[in-house]
Amino acid sequence: MYWFRRKYRQIQRVIDFFPLIWKGFDFDYQYAVDLFKKQLERTANHLESERAITLSAPIKVQKIRTAIRLMDKVYEEEYAHEYIDKIKELYGENTLDWWFEDTGKGNDSSYLRYEYEKWDNADEINEMKRKLFKESIDKQKRAHKLLWDFIEHNIQRWWD
C-alpha cells in the first residue's frame, strides 16, 4: 500500500513542478530561485496540513512564508525601483517618460531621452534621480543579503 501512495505523491509532484520546469532556461539563475521558492511553498503547505508531525510546524511555516515574501520583494526588484515612484512623487507623473532620439549617424543608433531633460530644473531632477537611484540599489542589496542570511539561519529547521 505504501508503494502506491508514494508513487501517487511522486506523480503529483512531477505535475506540480512541470510548468515551472517547462518554461525554465539554463542560462538564468532566476529559474533556480523559482524552483527553490516552489519547494519552500510545498514544504510550508505540508507543514500546514494534517500530515505534519512536529508541534513547531506553525512557527516553521511562518518563517518559510516570510522567506517567500522576502524572495518576492527581492527578485521582483521592489526596492531597486523605489526611486521611480519617489521621482514621480516629487516632480510629476510624466517626469521619467522617455523616447529614443536618432543620433543622425545613419546607423540606426539612438539616444535615450527623458521628458524632464526639456525642463528648466533638469539638472536638479537628474541629481535627485542619481541620489535616489543609489539609495534604491543599496536598499535592494541589503534586502538580498537579509533574505539569504535569514534562509541560512533557518533552513536547517524547515523539515517535519
Spans of features found by a protein language model:
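Long, non-globular targeting/processing and low-complexity regions
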Residues: M1-N154
